[in-house]
Each structure stands twice: as structure tokens, then as C-alpha cells.
């Protein structure tokens, strides 16, 4: 089975896949990373894992995940099925690259607008030639809600 882990600004999201089907998904605080990972690995026969993180990835996380037979750390050097035309490609968040790669895989040869509403709201555009053209980032729903009540 495959394990996909995303370390975001606020939460860690993980999902166990069998082929293209999500078997189970987990959401937890990063402080519980090792306990949750141990639980997932005990419960499922994980043979492949990919990790993306909006933060610098901790070395102890990598050491633990590299025990999985096939492990990939998604970063700016990972080959993805799109051409990144962003003006400063090394500053583009890895979470946004992951979403763009997913859009290209799910909707090949189509223009795609990806909207992700998490701690921040991001908007990213991929054209029908699988070229990432850029996007925008703005405060998330919670910050917007707080701002409405504050001002």
C-alpha cells in the first residue's frame, strides 16, 4: 500500500492508498507525528511513501520514513508531469506543486484552476499544455472571518 503525507502549516494529513483508492485518511497535529506514523505503519502494509512539507523537513522524520522500502521526499528537484513557468520556481510552495501535479494527472490537456482552502487560500493555474503559469496566495478562511469581526 502507498502512504501519502502532507505536512501543512497547521496540520499533518496522511492517506493510505491501494492503487488509486484511498483506504483511510488521517489528520493530526505535527507534535504527534511519530505516534501517528507508528500507528499507520502497524495497521497497514506500507511499501511506498511520499512526503511533502511546507516547512523544512525534520531530519528525524526523514530517517524514520526512509525505513519504508520506497520513499520519496517531494521537493523542488522531484520530477513532476508539468513545466513550471513561475517567475521564481524555487519559492513556490511544495504543496502547490503537488496540487498542480495532481491536476495535470487527473485532467490532462485541460486548463485547470486549483483552489486550496487551508491555513491560506491558494489559487494556481495550469494550462492545457501542462504549464504552471502562476497563482496567488491569500489569508485563509479563519483569518478572513476574524478580520471581519475585528474591523
Task: For each feature predicted by the language model, list its residue ranges.
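Divalent metal-binding pocket/active-site signature
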Residues: 115
Amino acid at each position: 500500500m502507498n502512504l501519502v503525507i502532507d505536512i501543512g502549516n497547521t496540520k499533518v494529513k496522511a492517506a493510505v492508498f491501494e492503487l488509486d483508492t484511498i483506504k483511510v485518511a488521517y489528520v493530526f497535529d505535527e507534535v504527534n507525528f511519530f505516534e501517528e506514523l507508528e500507528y499507520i505503519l502497524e495497521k497497514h502494509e506500507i511499501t511506498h511513501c511520499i512526503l511533502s512539507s511546507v516547512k523544512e523537513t525534520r531530519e528525524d522524520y526523514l530517517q524514520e520514513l526512509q525505513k519504508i522500502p520506497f520513499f520519496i521526499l517531494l521537493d523542488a528537484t522531484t520530477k513532476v508531469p508539468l513545466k513550471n513557468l513561475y517567475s521564481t520556481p524555487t519559492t513556490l510552495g511544495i504543496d502547490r506543486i503537488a496540487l498542480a501535479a495532481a491536476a495535470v494527472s487527473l485532467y490532462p490537456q485541460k486548463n485547470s484552476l486549483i483552489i486550496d482552502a487551508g491555513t491560506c487560500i491558494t489559487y494556481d493555474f495550469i494550462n492545457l499544455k501542462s504549464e504552471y503559469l502562476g497563482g496567488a496566495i491569500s489569508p485563509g478562511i479563519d483569518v478572513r472571518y476574524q478580520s471581519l469581526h475585528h474591523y
